[in-house]
Design a protein with these regions (language model features):
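Aromatic-anchored, glycine/proline-accented short structural segments
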Residues: 173-234
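Nucleotide/phosphate-binding catalytic cleft detector across ATP-hydrolyzing
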Residues: 1-178, 197-210, 238-311
Length: 311
């Protein structure tokens, strides 16, 4: 892979804050830095961390936070990232956590992924006001190290478009139209391009379909047996309810295909379809779909690449 950031005066970061996971990616001075963690924050305190892989325990503005799995299991009051807002308290702490994970320079420029319906000037202005020109101070309470980082610039980019740039880089489609789909926890983002990489707004949209809809099948089946579980519990409990999950993802593989065929005109005939997102790791799609390599990181990688072009 070509390195996309070679200068050492600032570091470009691609940041994808989802409802389930936060993904951050950067290439700086010939090295790759990345992290994935659950989009959950909560109160933090000193405990033993031996049973946790890559625990996140940080201090921001003299307040201690658990982030990710640690917040989900150990915080007395965990908060999930349940909205599209990138400037809520939860989002701000996730930004601090991402910077703590990958920042290797004291100046960064960030491209933040947003859904189609949030790709607006008003949203951008709110994000710029919240982050741009701000100095981020974050202490890693586990390693007892601190970082002070200036966010020099920040911009937003559609998540589906980010998948496009991750896949295509500087190539231009000349043979067929292309659709790029990022499947998230609650929604899926579609970006559509005609030959020559001309963006088609009419076919680019946010659709209410994601991993939570798939796991609702498991949730309802459990209720039939008087077992009450939240969707995030079903999702995060690896090894539990595997038979029900297998059926859910088999059904979803078929329904997902039908949704795309309905939304995209002449899909699979005149259009190459690329799919990304962590949900793709569970679906069994036919060969007409092109699953992006390491699909859970595709949006963050694409955002970082876009940052190398615009900053």
């Amino acid at each position: 892979m070509n390195r996309i950031q070679l200068e050492n005066d600032y570091q470009v970061i691609g940041l994808d804050i989802g409802r389930k996971n936060t993904k951050v990616y950067s290439e700086f001075n010939g090295e790759i830095y990345g992290a994935i963690f659950s989009s959950i924050i909560g109160d933090g305190r000193d405990i033993k961390f031996d049973d946790y892989k890559d625990p996140i325990y940080i201090s921001v503005d003299n307040t201690d936070y658990f982030v990710g799995e640690l917040a989900e299991k150990e915080s007395y009051s965990p908060t999930r990232n349940s909205s599209d807002s990138k400037i809520s308290l939860t989002a701000k702490i996730l930004v601090h956590s991402a910077i703590s994970k990958v920042a290797k320079c004291d100046k960064v420029r960030i491209v933040l992924g947003v859904p189609n319906n949030a790709y607006r000037k008003q949203v951008l202005l709110g994000i710029i006001e919240t982050y741009q020109g701000k100095i981020i101070k974050v202490k890693d309470k586990i390693t007892n190290t601190s970082k002070t980082v200036l966010i020099e610039m920040i911009d937003i980019f559609r998540e589906g478009d980010a998948v496009c740039y991750d896949v295509m880089r500087d190539r231009i489609n000349t043979d067929k139209d292309m659709a790029f789909i990022s499947v998230g926890f609650r929604t899926s983002e579609i970006s559509y391009f005609e030959k020559g990489m001309n963006f088609i707004d009419r076919l680019s949209k946010t659709i209410p379909y994601g991993n939570q809809h798939i796991l609702s099948y498991v949730q309802n089946k459990l209720k039939e047996n008087n077992i009450v579980k939240e969707l995030h519990e079903i999702d995060s409990n690896v090894g539990d309810y595997d038979d029900l999950k297998r059926i859910a993802y088999e059904l979803a593989s078929e329904s997902f295909t039908q949704k795309i065929e309905t939304i995209i005109e002449n899909s699979f005939v005149q259009t190459d379809v690329y799919v990304a997102g962590g949900t793709m790791l569970h679906l069994s799609l036919d060969t007409r779909f092109n699953t992006v390599e390491n699909p859970i990181m595709s949006v963050a990688r694409g955002l970082a690449y876009v940052g190398s072009l615009i900053f």
